[in-house]
């Protein structure tokens, strides 16, 4: 089932590919372990959490490289999804992506509802256009389902309530590296007493008492890049049932 989740993510979010790239600053010394370097790479973004008012991002600049034009203030993209398998061969996935253009100070995106099938059937996907004004999500498409309409209009990104100020206290993670990409992964066992875990359990139907894993993944330069990507996942999966939350916050050029 975990392979199913991996495949579904690759197919369903290949364009968005779950980024958390953007910020960079004081980085590692030669003595830092790869685990420490990965945490430092994430920290400059996660230190911004919680972003209670997303419009604050209009006044924040992320990591800039040669991909940016001089007159481009850049664009933040924030993303959260919640995926849960309800049957052995089906995975339901809902979430939102919002692009905040610092040049125009406008925010547009969409809420998505997806269902993936493991065998002999194409995935189903429906997108509902949204925009944000005065830190409020405004639904632009007609939605007949009142429950779905409410979920969209009241949606909160993980980055709006998450807090990783104690990230440096996560230690002894399981680290893996693929030098060919390069890509870097580290996993930590979380506690059900963790405030981030409590927040997720209060917002989503998570039918397990199992303490989740925090998974951090980076493709590309550890020191920062507008080309590579990072992914943060809190995985509650058990046995043959996938349950996880994906989050990213990225900073990319707005002008091509």
From Swiss-Prot:
Organism superkingdom: Bacteria
Signal peptide: 1-22
InterPro entries given in the database record: Csa, Csa_sf
Its membrane topology: Lipid-anchor
Disulfide bonds: none
PROSITE patterns: PROKAR_LIPOPROTEIN (PS51257)
Keywords carried by this UniProt record: Cell membrane, Lipoprotein, Membrane, Palmitate, Signal
Lipidated residue numbers (S-diacylglycerol cysteine): 23
Record's subcellular location: Cell membrane
Lipid-modified sites (N-palmitoyl cysteine): 23
Cellular component, GO annotation: plasma membrane
Transmembrane segments: none
Family indicated by similarity: Belongs to the staphylococcal tandem lipoprotein family.
Official protein name in the record: Uncharacterized lipoprotein SAB0393
Upper lineage: Bacteria, Bacillati, Bacillota, Bacilli, Bacillales
